[in-house]
Amino acid sequence: MKKGLLLFSICFCFLNLYSQRALTGVVLDATTREPVPGATIKMSDSTSTLTDGKGKFVINDPVPDSVHVTATGYIHQHLSTLERSSLQVLLFADHREMDAVVVSGTMRPVKRLESPVNVEVYTPQFFKKNPAPSIFESLQNINGVRPQLNCSVCNTGDIHINGLEGPYTMVTIDGMPIVSSLASVYGLFGIPTQLIDRVEIVKGPASGLYGSEAIGGLINIITKSPDKAPAFTANIMATSWQEYNVDLGGAFKIGNKVKSLLGVDYYNFQHKADKNNDQFTDVTLQHRISVFNKLSFKRKKDRVATLAGRYFYEDRWGGDMRWNKTFRGGDSLYGESIYTNRWEVMGQYQLPVEEKMALSFSATRHQQNSYYGNTPYMGDQRIVFGQLVWDKKIGMSHSLLSGAALRYNYYDDNSTATTDTLTGRNNPDNYIIPGLFLQDEWKLNARHLVLLGLRYDHHPVHKGIFTPRIAWKWSLSDRQVFRLNAGTGFRVVSLFTEDHAALTGARAVEIRESLDPERSYNVNLNYIHSFRWDDISLSVDASAWYSYFTNQIIADYDSDPNLIVYKNLDGYAASKGFTLNVEFNKGHRFKALAGVTIQDVHKSEKNGAGHSVKTRPVLTEKWSGTWTISYTLPSAGLTFDYTGNLYGPMRLPLLSATDPRPGHSPVWSIQNIQCSKLISNKLEVFAGVKNLLNWTPAKSTPFIIARSHDPFDKNVQYDASGGVVATPENPYALSFDPTYVYAPNQGIRVFGGVRYTVR
């Protein structure tokens, strides 16, 4: 009898276990097959679960007949689970990005649609449509943003936003201001795109939170979290110009409380090319490596603690095709050779208190050893930054953000800028700028939100600096938002970082007066409307802006061809314009993003007769357009991308009235195509063509570099006043000048590569 009862009990347990059912699943991005962590799996009884860091989930008995899967930035999915023990959910990205979480506008994580400041979000999927080895090149297909090359020889550049020059744009990494001043000249080339989670762009004033360098715009590069990054990634690319780029990343655990994200980026281009036959390299030869490591620490109550570091080294040169390093610093063959050593440390620590308080910090050192012909430039910059932020909600209507910041800046070079003119001793420029800021988000009602902000900085020379800001958001509907932003800005120049031409040997720098700091007043209007019909979505993003500058510090190229004259503008400068972005998506197959910008950037100053004269600065276009068009065949795993930009004429710097080069650039365009094939959820291959039209500036001018055959001006003759004299050997009265550049000199090329990912 006992044996029978025991046998019956065992059989009953087995039957009971068999009748129980569990559902396991994974949520993946439909395009990249990358896991989607944090996705919500909602069941019919209103209970829900979240996917883990690898996109996986488990639902134990009882298993519902269907589930509803949602994730930020993706289109929702409703799926049946009948007679299934496992489920693979493919989510298609909602490219309208209306619900994307942003932090740059207010320093607080908030959905893009709810932010009072318009923040544009660009993910790695956007940058993959036209792959590039650096973030500098990746920005070329963003409307209103233009990477500008400033030298035909060394290919230094900066980033223009809405027609304003690079120094008006602040570039941060994870919100830390470590890419500035000296680093902004070459440092933008060393940020690996493989480790970027997203790029957030604020067009217009952001000085109230980020300080004086953000008066024209902000580019915040947000790196991936070690908690969500794949176990291993590899991105390898090569071009027909013999450019080679290897980008590796890996995430792993260190013990039970630390997660690490390690990335290594290597770029090599050593192929000398001279397609325009001026005996100078068309593209700077480069050899660089960047190593990045980010640690995330597990703490009680999920408090944040991260620590990251990056090391960057680059050896680049351009110049005479016969040049090699034995000629470095000499005056027989001209070459511009730059060695860059740079390290960065940054982190964030949420304080162990009941209030939401966090300390952010960064430190960086940038060393540049360079020769521009026979002109040496040895620069050394160190920046230490710390910021304590308190995020406090008061009642139902007010969200306060207050903080204190401290920035230490050290700068030294071998020029007279850091030399005591009385004693001849070296006198590095170093100073501390403390700052305080306060911001209040005031929710008037469900439709209206007002943001009020004020920042105070104390500059050692210019003393107290107030930068107020105000923003108003009006939610006309769930998919329709109107924003108004206004603020002021304050800026002091750094001569080398703002005019690299000062070191090319082409022009000498002259400062005729004590330079006062710039002041700016900005206003920005933004309107967003999103539409949805069945499998078609459309979104419209329109903005208008106006910026007014007093005491603007300008570089005058026109008064004397041998000088760059720095002075405060006796008058005013202004930038105004309109920008429009349109996104269209059809059934997860066809996607298009197109944008156009129309702008009027000018300065007004009095001439000798006392009359106001309005002029347009050099290298500033009146209009531009960008587009990204993609078509996907999901069953075949194929995606086709067509990207490009189009720029209107811009004024170019001429040496004299007899300079035969055109005074304005033609309408020009860079266009690219790419085909990518998803082999598996781990492997993807891609190939394409860059610069389809084979456009280079040499097509519209007799020469790009003036007197490239005499770069040291040994055969140039001058008159008593220092002006260049026309001779039979120099009929146009020119001197060596490589600053006549507005577009890349690199023509058409084929590229290809592979992307490999292990979850």
Could you say what each language-model-derived stretch is?
Residues 57-60, 160, 176-203, 291, ...:
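Short acidic/polar hinge/loop motifs at secondary-structure boundaries
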Residues 257, 358-370, 475, 483, ...:
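Membrane-embedded beta-barrel scaffold of Gram-negative outer-membrane proteins
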Residues 136-177, 197:
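Extracytoplasmic beta-strand/coil segments of soluble accessory domains associated
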Residues 443-446, 544-548, 568-655, 755-757:
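Gram-negative outer-membrane beta-barrel transporters
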Residues 85-90, 135-138, 155-160, 172, ...:
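N-terminal periplasmic accessory domains that precede
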Residues 269-290, 296-357, 363-383:
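Flexible loop and strand-edge segments within Gram-negative outer membrane beta-barrel domains
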